Amino acid sequence: VAVYTHLGAEDLARLIAKYDAGRLVSAKGIAEGVSNSNWLIETTQARYILTMYERRIELADLPFFLALLDHLSEAGCPVPRTIHDRSGAPFRMVGEKAAALIEFLPGVSPTTPDPDQARAVGSALAQIHLAAGSFAMSRPNDLGPQQTSAILHECGADALASIDPNLPRILDVATGIARNWPNDLPLSIIHSDLFPDNVLMLGDRVTGMIDFYFACTGAMAYDLAVTHAAWCFDRSGMHLNQALGAALVEGYDSVRPLNKSERDHLPLLAQGACLRFIASRAQDWLDTPADALVRRKDPMDFVHRLEFYRDKGQSAFS
């Protein structure tokens, strides 16, 4: 999450007044991530997160994302609900940009997760996959291996080399992953971006899973592979915490056991997960305005992960 758009106190107060959410007391911009502008809102009634959609998120997709939050919340998943305005609308337009008010959930994102926390996250992810099975809407994955391979090739070898001289080597790898991608694994709505900073915890209990703005219809095992890649390595992406990875998969299996095909495909799915983050990070690195209040993230961290999964295969998950 990040702050691209700057709204004054009067603008924010006017917006909050459209909701039955109390009067604005304070608003604090949150400066992390790259896709939206976010504020922590405190009113006379409660705390909320206000999100303004800046990049990647199409207006036509917002009803899907926000209805999904409501569906999962109503199913008992640790997911924040959308706060609808006085007219019942799940989002409002502020100028040419859409903004939504989201329930604030307690908890903190784990910076150095332990196996008990990873196990709880695996269980919560499986719970979401099962609950999403009855969600009436669908959305294609626009960041699957075919698309992310295309993004990297559109960036081009020269631009990728300007980020890191070793990055262009990923182009041939991307083509191979896209060519071998499985299309017959069990599907549901998946989160597809479940990094530790998108999970809130109190101790080893998951209190919130947030930022569903890459959610789509996809292979459930791919979502587990995304989470494995996001949670179980050190910052460099060179060293896997095997105990963390085993606990994550055990937690998932305890709620929704993987079938043999899903388990066999985990190494390739994880490489595809890494490819997705390499592509989005490279694109963000090249496109992010110099004066934006954001941190640029190094795509090489996920090149190292991808190479690990390619070298270790199934042993990365045992």
Locate the predicted segments by residue.
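Conserved NTP-binding catalytic cores of kinases and kinase-like/nucleotidyltransferase enzymes
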Residues: V1-R86, L202-R205, S315-F317
